[in-house]
Amino acid sequence: MEAEAAAKRARESGDAAAAGAGEQAGISAVIPGWFSEISPMWPGEAHSLKVEKVLFQGKSDYQNVMVFQSSTYGKVLVLDGVIQVTERDECAYQEMITHLPLCSIKDPKKVLVIGGGDGGVLREVSRHSSVEQIDICEIDKMVVDVSKQFFPHLAVGFEDPRVSLHIGDGVAFLKNAPEGTYDAVIVDSSDPIGPAQELFEKPFFQSVARALRPGGVVCTQAESIWLHMHIIEDIVANCRQVFKGSVNYAWTTVPTYPSGVIGFMLCSTEGPTVDFQHPIFNIEDNEFSTKSKGPLKFYNSEIHSASFCLPSFAKRVIGSKAN
């Protein structure tokens, strides 16, 4: 009731426009001091975090960028009003999107990261001693700069000498990559609205497949089974048409992502068989990994295999796209 009264007072005092602007930026105008994540990607619901202090607000050529200190999840990176990273739970996403593909193939040497401007995926890729070359293509330099300033534990990935940073369009970068260049491609994209839209479409997956060696692997962010089954259906259908090796869907928990879960699409090109559900490299006990970046916080071999176990409703829908 108090929130409703506050909203009514705002409207009556002519502050409705300001309230709307606040919602668009992601800061709730109805409950001061709280960030509310509101998006057409999850209509009718919002996730809120208490804001201790706004540390950065800016607008790049592509999106609104904000960093704030929350009371329970540490520093939070927000792009266009949507949470991308929090200090508390980033490990679940970064470790899973990286080690699900890289622990499923033998000695990956060349890895491409599309997106991932916060540096977290780079941090995890650099745990693999077999990797000789890590290319990253991020469209928004502001994301990289902000991460280096406010999230050094993530941006440490940029310091690895094997990393080459390319600021530009990931779709164009892939089209220009020589055929069969990479052992693995990791697509750390935001939701399929705005600049990330192309990263969920069939032509992009075709470019990924061309850039991979035979038996090469890709892992891409693939939304929530609770909110986006219609999107996941399309992704699965496109991937089954493009990738002639393995095609699997995995998921994990990330408390600050919509519905508290996020999915991953894992595919391999025709060639040596890839069994994504059973990792062949045990990174959690790897001395190089622990020495270079410290112990893993989330990923292990058991959770790797478990992540492919789907609820019945999701299993039916994803299985229906098998042909």
From Swiss-Prot:
PROSITE patterns: PABS_1, PABS_2
Binding-site residues, putrescine: Y93, D188, S189, S190, D191, Y257
Enzyme superclass (EC): transferase
Gene3D superfamilies membership: Spermidine synthase, tetramerisation domain, Vaccinia Virus protein VP39
Binding site for S-adenosyl 3-(methylsulfanyl)propylamine: Q63, Q94, D118, E138, D169, G170, D188
EC number(s) per entry: 2.5.1.16
Catalytic residues (positions): D188 (proton acceptor)
Gene Ontology BP term (one): spermidine biosynthetic process
Domain PABS: 32-269
Disulfide links within the chain: none
Keywords from the named record: Polyamine biosynthesis, Spermidine biosynthesis, Transferase
Swiss-Prot/TrEMBL catalytic activity: S-adenosyl 3-(methylsulfanyl)propylamine + putrescine = S-methyl-5'-thioadenosine + spermidine + H(+)
Pathway the protein takes part in: Amine and polyamine biosynthesis; spermidine biosynthesis; spermidine from putrescine: step 1/1
GO cellular component: cytosol
CDD domains: AdoMet_MTases
Top-level taxon in the UniProt lineage: Eukaryota
Pfam families, alphabetized: Spermine_synt_N, Spermine_synth
GO molecular function, one term: spermidine synthase activity
Family of this protein: Belongs to the spermidine/spermine synthase family.
NCBIfam families reported for this sequence: MFS_SpdSyn, PRK00811.1, speE
Alphabetized HAMAP family for the sequence: Spermidine_synth
Protein's recorded name: Spermidine synthase 1
